UniProtKB/Swiss-Prot annotation:
Residues 136-211 form the CTLH domain. Residues 103-135 form the LisH domain. This is WD repeat-containing protein 26. Residues 1-18 have a biased composition (Gly residues). The gene is Wdr26. It comes from Mus musculus (Mouse). The keyword RNA-binding does not apply.
């Protein structure tokens, strides 16, 4: 096949002259050669490789075609042969030139597309000419230019030239990701619809209402495609000015921006051998970076799709030294076992509850990440085993152990007790969760109490006979998840008083927590350890190994950027950290001397974590000393030894 109509073939005749343009397009798409070109030794690749240099036999009938369809012909072949004879080195070079592999051609085209996007057009022309490849099919080039110029009639004619390429069997295979229901005829109709829609909107913006109406009635409507969209487009006729049109249509307006977006949409319908998908090299590089991040066990920085934020010259590997594996501070103000710790939602404070009957609120220094005592809340006679921050961090609710029938609601800013709630001396209120509106909370315990209350402690609703171990309010504002003594997690709807089973374990659920998106649940299961459940599919996703979990209540947590990590205390005095996708721990933190009851990851500072222990201390964990936090990405180049 002589790509793009380049001259060649036996006796200096045009290669493939017997082919119709449609058949030539099909051959270009399918990687087929015309009979005459084959006999002359010229083979073309499916993505448009131009004919190779003259063969070792020195056949003058071969022709070297110029990029993008500029004819070479017999004269060019003769000139090349003469140059080869005059310059032995050049002739030898041409003779030794090998046909590029498919992957090499693909890479060259990707590079060419990227360079084109940078405006290095002359470099692209030279690259295509020297490699013998072409960036895209000539018809696709015309189509691109006409779309960007807004020449809609010519662009529509170009679609007819592209039709054989869209209809070819190879195109069907390449576009396997498209829905099977999309017929080949439908693809052309969709592309035409997108073109005419842009044409219609540009007429409207220019104030050419009659021309726009003509496009709507005589061109768009007869396509009988997406009638709902046509009704929407007809409504734009009522727009009084261009700004109103752009706002209602969510459209950038006539010009390069909107036409580039249109072209991106149109390219998805064409096989890549005809026209490359938009910004294909950037897409591949971004995918490679994302895969490396996914495989990086210690990656704990914000995901950024901008390739400028990473180096493409080295593999991405984060150092363990930037991970919260090192003790930064030991808080010793509690004088007895510390049962619970929890960072505020804004990450500026930490609340710790202890058997010593106090709650201590700590302030996090935004610069040094060190904590200092802010307030001590006293009077919890039975100790504090659970704490919950209100959504806006203005209030703090504290619960006690099994024997405690009271619940304390504190004003964080003033340190004053707003409400001390107790429904009955027989109650056991050991868990609490805030409704997302911040005006209600639910509380309960193992003696069968399950209440919904307002900020003044007034009882709004109750659910009888539910022995609650742990609670969590979902973001829908209606559903409350509760683990109970039947080794399950159930969902309770306080609006219609319905309930349903969500998770069923074989052993007691000591505590659980929910991911920010409400999809995953992390359970601490007696004698089993830490389990990850998918609440939507209601399946057990993973069992994490290493932790020692008996019948003590241990609270684990999600943490890090994107909640990619899981941390839990353990009865063997350690803190265990796992990557969410790995069952084996990536870190075991030592330092506590008794059971670690609770771990909390700072939601705003992903390199900070707190752990509370029966040894009476709270440990603050962070990166290794002397890490420059402003240049943490520089630490991602090598794994710490």
């Amino acid at each position: 096949m002589q790509a793009n109509g380049a001259g060649g073939g036996g006796g200096g005749g045009g290669g493939g002259q017997g082919q119709t343009p449609e058949l030539a397009c099909l051959s270009a798409q399918n990687g087929e050669s015309s009979p005459s070109a084959t006999s002359a030794g010229d083979l073309a690749h499916a993505n448009g490789l131009l004919p190779a240099a003259p063969s070792a036999a020195g056949n003058n009938s071969n022709s070297l075609s110029v990029n993008n369809g500029v004819p070479g012909g017999a004269a060019a072949a003769s000139a090349t042969a003469a140059a080869a004879q005059a310059t032995p080195e050049l002739g030898s070079s041409l003779k030794k030139k090998k046909r590029l592999s498919q992957s090499d051609e693909d890479v060259i085209r990707l590079i060419g597309q990227h360079l084109n996007g940078l405006g290095l057009n002359q470099t692209v022309d030279l690259l295509m000419q020297e490699s013998g490849c072409r960036l895209e099919h000539p018809s696709a080039t015309k189509f691109r230019n006409h779309v960007m110029e807004g020449d809609w009639d010519k662009a529509e004619n170009d679609l007819n030239e592209l039709k054989p390429l869209v209809h070819s069997p190879h195109a069907i295979v390449v576009r396997g990701a498209l829905e099977i229901s999309q017929t080949l005829l439908g693809i052309i109709v969709r592309m035409k619809f997108l073109l005419l829609q842009q044409k219609y909107l540009e007429y409207l913006e220019d104030g050419k209402v009659l021309e726009a109406l003509q496009v709507l009635r005589c061109e768009l409507t007869p396509l009988k495609y997406n009638t709902e969209r046509i009704h929407v487009l007809s409504g734009y006729l009522m727009c009084s000015h261009a700004e109103d049109l752009r706002a209602k249509a969510e459209w950038e307006g006539k010009g390069t921006a909107s036409r580039s977006k249109l072209l991106d949409k149109l390219q998805t319908y064409l096989p890549p051998s005809v026209m490359l998908p938009p910004r294909r090299l950037q897409t591949l590089l971004r995918q490679a970076v994302e895969l490396q991040r996914d495989r990086c066990l210690y990656h704990n920085t914000k995901l950024d799709n901008n390739l400028d934020s990473v180096s493409l010259l080295i593999d991405h590997v984060c150092s363990r030294r930037q991970f919260p594996c090192y003790t930064q501070q030991i808080l010793t103000e509690h004088c007895n076992e510390v049962w619970f710790c929890k960072f505020s939602n804004d990450g500026t404070k930490l609340a710790t509850g202890s058997k010593d009957t106090t709650v201590i609120i700590w302030q996090v220094d935004p610069d040094t990440h060190l904590l200092k005592l802010l307030k001590t809340l006293e009077g919890h006679a039975y100790g504090v085993s659970y704490i919950a921050w209100s959504p806006d961090d203005s209030y703090l609710v504290a619960c006690g152990p099994d024997d405690c029938s009271e619940l304390w609601l504190w004003n964080v800013q003033t340190g004053e007790l707003r409400t001390k709630m107790s429904q009955s001396h027989e109650d056991s209120l050991t868990s609490v969760a805030w409704n997302p509106d911040g005006k209600r909370f639910v509380t309960g315990g193992q003696r069968g109490q399950f209440y919904q209350c307002d900020l003044d402690g007034n009882l709004l609703d109750s659910w009888e006979g539910v022995r609650v171990q742990c609670l969590w309010c979902l973001s829908d504002g209606k559903t409350v998840l509760a683990s109970d003594t039947h080794q399950r997690v159930r969902g309770y709807n306080f609006e219609d008083l319905t309930d349903r089973n969500i998770v069923q374990e074989d052993h007691p659920i000591m505590s659980f927590t929910i991911s920010k998106n409400g999809r995953l649940a992390l359970l601490n299961v007696a004698t089993q350890g830490v389990h990850l459940w998918d609440l939507q599919d209601r399946v057990l996703v993973r069992k994490y190994q290493g932790v020692t979990q008996g019948f003590y209540t241990i609270h684990s947590c999600f943490g890090g950027h994107n909640e990619d990590f899981i941390a839990s205390g353990s009865e063997d005095h350690k803190v265990y950290i796992w990557h969410k996708r790995s069952e084996l721990p990536i870190a075991e933190l030592t330092g506590h001397t008794r059971t670690v009851n609770c771990v909390s990851w700072n939601p705003q500072i992903p390199s900070m974590m707190a752990s509370a222990s029966d040894d009476g201390t709270v440990r603050i964990w962070g990166p290794a000393p002397f890490i420059d936090h402003q240049n943490i990405e520089e630490e991602c180049s090598s794994m710490d030894s």
